[in-house]
C-alpha cells in the first residue's frame, strides 16, 4: 500500500520545493534523473513526484522510466534539494516555512557532515547577507561561482561621493585572493568565514577611535586532530578590499590580536606605517593558542579603511609542489607567440610597422645582446620562467624565483616590477630551448646575440661546440647564406680576328667585355678567329702576355730573367676589370675589330684605331713620348731550366687560352713611326704612378679621326710609350733587334697627366725592381728595366702567385 504523501515528510518537502521550481530547474532535475524533459510545467512536476511516490510501475505511462532505470527516493530528494539551494543562492537560505509543510508536518533540516563552511554557494558576501540584489559582481576564479554585493566589496576611494564606484576589469573574491596571495598554503577549511571589518570612526580630536572586532568559532575534534600534524596550521588572515596589490595580506594600522585572551604580534612594521606597494604582511599562526571546542578571537585596530578578516586551516606546500602547479612548457604558451614577442622586442616594433609609420624606434644594430642570468640571483637561468601578461621578453630562473618567494611572498616580476600571482607564471618556450642548450657550457657563458628575425648565437669562444654559430629560433643550426652577389671573374676564351692593315683603315682589334644578365663580367666570343698569333701563358686564373725579345737583346742585357726580378714582375700584374672614365668619345665604326672596355649593356662601344692614333714620336704641339721598353711585362708560368730567354718560351700555352696579342702596325702603316739606334733609354715617363698593388679603377679607350684631334687638354685613357727631347728635336724609340718589328702606340693624355708625369719622370733605372705604372691604362704591365742577363741554364724555379689577371701586350712577329 502506497504511503499517503501527507504521511511522508520527504515527499512533502520535495513537493513543496518542486512547486517553487521554474521550468528550467525542473528540466535540470529530469536531466539528472534520465527522464524525458518534454511537457508542461505540471507534467514535469508529476514525473518527479511519481519517482518519489514508489509508483513507477503504475505511472510508467506518465514518466516513461523503465524499471531498470529506477532510482531511489533519497537520490531524487538530494537532487531536488541541491537544485533548490542553487536557485535561492545558499543551502541555508530556505524560508522559515521550509521546515513546516502546509499540513503542519515538521521537516528536520539535513545536518552537515562537518563544521566547515560551505564554499560551493552562489552568493556569499562578507556582509553576512546571502541574498542577491540588483548589484552583484562575480568572481573570476576558474573554480569559484561566488557572487558578492558590489557595495560590500568594491569600496570607493572617496566615500563621500554619491557616484557609484567603478568596477575593476578583473575581480576576485576574498577567498580567491587569499589563496593566490601565498600558494605555499592551501586552504583546507574555514572555521571563520570572511567577514567585513568596517572603518573606524573619527574622534572629536580628529583621530580615529580604536574599534574592536570579536568572533567566536568552534573547533571540532576532527579539525583539532588535523592541526596536530606538522603540515597543518590554523592561520588568521586579513586583506584590504580596494588594495592596489590584490594578492597579498594587509593588516590595519595599530592592529592587535588576542586569541583566547593571549596577545599575538600581527605585523613587523611600525603600527602607524602603511604597507607600501612592494611590502607584504604575514598571517599569524594560531595553532599553539587554540583548543578543541569554542575559541575567541579579538582584533583591535584604528584605520579608516575597510578590511576583510578570516580564519582558515591550511596545509603547507613544498617548493616542488608549488613548481608542479606551473604549466608545462607546451601548455603555457605557444612557441609562435613567444617568437613574435622576441621579434617585436628586438626589432623595435610589430611586423606591420613600415617606413611610413610615425614610430620613433629604429633598428641600428643587426643583433641585440641578451643576458641569460637571473635578475634575482645572478646565476645563469636553468628554466626560463616569466609572467604571461608581461610584454617584455625578460625571463628569470623559475626554481630560484619560487624558492625565494617562499619567504617573501612577493609574486612580482623582477623585470617590470608588476604584481601577479602564481597562476600567471609560465615557461618561456623560446628562451627555455636556448638555456637548455647552454647548460653544457661553462658558467662564464651567459650572453647571446639575437637578431630581429629571432635567430641567435652564444657569445663566446670556439669551445662552445657550435653554439657560437647562428641558430634558427627553434634551435637548429642556421645554414650560412650570403645574399650579396660576389663577382665571379672567369677567364673566357676569345678568338680575335686579325685583318690585314691598310693605309686607309689600318688594323683594329676588338676585345668586348660586358656584364651579362647575372651581373658577371664576360668576354664576348667571336667565331672568325685566327689562332696563329703570339701566345699567352695561363696558370689557372693567371694570364699574362710575353713581350717580344730576341737573342740579340738578351746578349746585350736588355732582358733580365733573374728570379728576384720575376717574383717582382709577377706581383705587379693587374687585371683588365675596369670601367670607363671618359665617355665623351664618339663611337667607332663597328665593321672592324676594336678594343672595348665597358660595364654598360649597350652595344655602342668606344674604339681605338691604330690609324686614328698618331704614331709619330713628336706630337702636333711638339711633345714627344718614349716608347714602351721591349721587356717582359709579366711571367706567370714556369720556364724550363736551360731555356733561353726567347720569345717562343712564352707562347707554349697560347692554344689553350686562344687569346691573340695586339698586332703591331708595320712601319708602312704609320708614317710617323721612327726608329733610332738608342737602346731603350727610359726617361721622362709621363704617368701618374699608383701603387703597383692597387687595382685600376677606371679605364677608357677612345679613338678619333685620322687627324688625331686628341690634344693635351683632353682626358686620354692611355699613356704613350714614346718620348722626345725637351726641345722636341730628337725622337727616341726602343729598338728590339728586328728591323721590321716595331710596336709604337702614342696616346695623348690630359694636361694634368703631363704635369704630374713630368714631376715624376725622373729616370727610373733600378735593376732590382724596375717597374713602370701606367695610370688609367688598359694594359698595366710590370716591366723590368734593362739589366745584366744571367748565363743560360742558371735560372731558378719560381713560385707563381695566382691572381685574376688579364694582361695584353702588343708585339710583332
UniProtKB/Swiss-Prot annotation:
GO terms for biological process: protein sumoylation. PROSITE patterns: SAP (PS50800), ZF_PHD_1 (PS01359), ZF_SP_RING (PS51044). GO terms for cellular component: chromatin; nucleus. Zn(2+) binds at residues 390, 392, 413, 416. InterPro entries: SAP_dom, SAP_dom_sf, SIZ1/2_SP-RING, Zinc_finger_PHD-type_CS, Znf_FYVE_PHD, Znf_MIZ, Znf_PHD, Znf_RING/FYVE/PHD. Its main location: nucleus. The keyword Nucleus applies. It is found in: Nucleus. A zinc finger (SP-RING-type) spans 357-440. Residues 18-52 form the SAP domain. Its EC number is 2.3.2.-. Residues 88-114, 617-650, 753-775 are annotated as: Disordered. SUPFAM superfamilies: FYVE/PHD zinc finger, SAP domain. Pathway: Protein modification; protein sumoylation. A zinc finger (PHD-type) spans 122-179. Residues 88-103, 753-764 have a biased composition (Polar residues). GO terms for molecular function: SUMO ligase activity; zinc ion binding. Keywords: Metal-binding, Nucleus, Transferase, Ubl conjugation pathway, Zinc, Zinc-finger. Pfam families: SAP (PF02037), zf-MIZ (PF02891). Probable SUMO E3 ligase that may regulate Pi starvation responses. PANTHER family: E3 SUMO-PROTEIN LIGASE SIZ2, ZINC FINGER MIZ DOMAIN-CONTAINING PROTEIN. Belongs to the PIAS family. This is E3 SUMO-protein ligase SIZ2. The gene is SIZ2.
Amino acid at each position: 500500500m502506497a504511503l499517503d504523501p501527507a504521511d511522508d515528510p520527504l515527499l512533502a518537502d520535495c513537493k513543496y520545493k518542486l512547486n517553487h521550481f521554474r521550468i528550467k530547474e525542473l528540466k535540470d532535475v529530469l536531466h539528472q534523473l534520465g527522464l524525458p524533459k518534454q511537457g508542461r510545467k505540471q507534467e514535469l512536476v508529476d514525473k518527479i513526484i511519481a519517482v518519489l511516490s514508489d509508483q513507477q510501475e503504475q505511472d510508467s505511462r506518465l514518466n516513461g522510466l523503465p524499471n531498470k532505470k529506477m532510482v531511489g527516493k533519497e537520490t531524487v530528494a538530494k537532487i531536488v534539494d541541491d537544485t533548490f539551494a542553487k536557485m535561492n543562492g545558499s543551502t541555508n537560505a530556505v524560508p522559515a516555512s521550509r521546515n513546516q509543510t502546509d499540513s503542519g508536518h515538521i521537516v528536520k533540516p539535513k545536518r552537515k557532515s562537518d563544521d566547515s563552511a560551505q564554499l560551493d554557494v552562489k552568493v556569499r558576501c562578507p556582509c553576512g547577507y546571502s541574498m542577491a540584489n540588483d548589484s552583484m559582481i562575480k568572481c573570476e576564479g576558474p573554480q569559484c561561482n561566488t557572487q558578492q554585493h558590489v557595495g560590500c566589496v568594491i569600496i570607493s576611494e572617496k566615500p563621500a561621493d554619491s557616484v557609484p564606484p567603478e568596477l575593476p576589469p578583473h575581480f576576485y573574491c576574498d577567498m580567491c585572493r587569499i589563496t593566490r596571495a601565498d600558494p605555499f598554503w592551501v586552504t583546507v577549511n574555514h572555521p571563520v568565514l570572511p567577514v567585513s571589518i568596517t572603518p573606524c570612526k573619527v574622534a572629536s580630536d580628529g583621530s580615529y577611535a580604536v574599534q574592536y572586532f570579536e568572533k567566536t568559532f568552534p573547533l571540532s575534534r576532527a579539525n583539532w586532530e588535523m592541526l596536530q600534524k606538522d603540515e597543518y596550521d590554523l592561520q588568521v588572515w586579513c586583506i584590504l578590499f580596494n588594495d592596489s596589490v590584490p594578492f597579498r595580506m594587509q593588516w590595519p594600522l595599530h592592529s592587535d590580536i588576542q586569541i583566547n585572551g593571549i596577545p599575538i604580534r600581527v605585523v613587523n612594521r611600525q603600527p602607524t606605517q602603511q604597507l607600501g606597494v612592494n611590502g607584504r604582511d604575514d598571517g599569524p599562526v594560531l595553532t599553539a593558542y587554540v583548543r578543541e571546542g569554542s575559541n575567541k578571537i579579538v582584533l583591535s585596530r584604528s584605520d579608516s579603511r575597510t578590511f576583510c578578516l578570516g580564519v582558515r586551516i591550511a596545509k603547507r606546500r613544498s617548493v616542488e609542489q608549488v613548481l608542479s602547479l606551473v604549466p608545462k612548457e607546451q601548455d603555457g604558451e605557444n612557441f609562435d607567440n613567444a617568437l613574435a614577442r622576441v621579434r617585436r622586442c628586438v626589432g623595435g616594433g610589430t611586423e606591420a610597422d613600415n617606413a611610413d609609420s610615425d614610430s620613433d624606434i629604429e633598428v641600428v644594430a643587426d643583433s641585440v645582446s641578451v643576458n641569460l642570468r637571473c635578475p634575482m640571483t645572478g646565476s645563469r637561468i636553468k628554466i626560463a620562467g616569466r609572467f604571461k601578461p608581461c610584454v617584455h621578453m625578460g625571463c628569470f630562473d623559475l626554481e630560484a624565483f619560487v624558492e625565494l618567494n617562499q619567504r617573501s611572498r612577493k609574486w612580482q616580476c623582477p623585470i617590470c616590477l608588476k604584481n601577479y600571482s602564481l597562476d600567471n607564471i609560465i615557461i618561456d618556450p623560446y628562451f627555455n630551448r636556448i638555456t637548455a642548450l647552454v647548460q653544457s657550457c661553462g658558467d662564464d657563458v651567459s650572453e647571446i646575440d639575437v637578431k630581429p628575425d629571432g635567430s641567435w648565437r652564444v657569445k663566446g669562444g670556439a669551445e662552445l661546440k657550435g653554439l657560437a654559430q647562428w641558430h634558427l629560433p627553434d634551435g637548429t643550426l642556421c645554414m650560412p647564406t650570403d645574399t650579396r652577389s660576389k663577382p665571379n671573374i672567369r677567364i673566357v676564351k676569345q678568338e680575335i680576328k686579325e685583318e690585314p692593315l691598310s693605309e686607309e683603315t689600318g688594323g683594329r682589334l676588338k676585345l668586348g667585355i660586358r656584364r651579362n644578365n647575372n651581373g658577371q663580367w664576360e668576354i664576348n666570343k667571336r667565331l672568325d678567329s685566327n689562332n696563329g698569333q703570339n701566345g699567352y701563358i695561363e696558370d689557372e686564373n693567371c694570364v699574362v702576355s710575353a713581350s717580344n725579345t730576341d737573342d740579340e737583346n738578351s746578349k746585350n742585357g736588355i732582358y733580365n730573367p733573374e728570379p728576384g726580378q720575376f717574383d717582382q714582375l709577377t706581383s705587379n700584374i693587374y687585371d683588365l676589370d675596369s670601367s670607363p672614365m671618359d665617355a665623351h668619345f664618339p663611337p667607332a665604326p663597328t665593321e672592324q675589330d676594336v678594343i672595348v672596355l665597358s660595364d654598360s649593356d649597350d652595344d655602342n662601344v668606344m674604339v681605338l684605331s691604330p690609324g686614328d692614333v698618331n704614331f709619330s714620336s713628336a706630337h702636333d704641339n711638339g711633345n714627344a713620348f718614349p716608347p714602351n721598353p721591349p721587356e717582359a711585362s709579366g711571367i706567370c708560368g714556369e720556364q724550363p731550366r736551360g731555356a733561353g730567354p726567347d720569345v717562343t718560351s712564352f707562347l707554349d700555352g697560347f692554344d689553350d687560352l686562344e687569346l691573340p696579342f695586339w698586332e703591331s702596325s708595320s712601319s708602312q702603316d704609320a708614317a710617323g713611326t721612327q726608329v733610332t739606334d738608342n737602346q731603350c733609354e727610359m726617361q721622362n715617363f709621363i704617368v701618374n704612378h699608383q701603387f703597383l698593388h692597387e687595382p685600376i679603377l677606371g679605364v677608357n679607350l677612345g679613338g678619333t679621326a685620322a687627324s688625331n684631334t686628341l690634344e693635351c687638354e683632353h682626358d686620354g685613357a692611355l699613356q704613350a710609350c714614346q718620348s722626345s727631347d725637351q726641345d722636341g728635336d730628337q725622337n727616341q724609340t726602343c729598338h728590339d733587334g728586328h728591323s721590321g718589328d716595331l710596336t709604337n702606340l702614342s696616346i695623348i693624355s690630359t694636361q694634368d697627366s703631363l704635369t704630374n708625369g713630368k714631376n715624376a719622370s725622373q729616370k727610373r733605372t733600378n735593376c732590382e725592381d724596375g717597374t713602370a705604372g701606367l695610370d688609367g691604362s688598359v694594359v698595366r704591365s710590370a716591366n723590368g728595366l734593362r739589366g745584366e742577363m744571367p748565363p743560360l741554364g742558371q735560372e731558378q724555379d719560381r713560385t707563381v702567385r695566382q691572381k685574376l689577371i688579364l694582361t695584353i701586350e702588343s708585339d710583332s712577329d
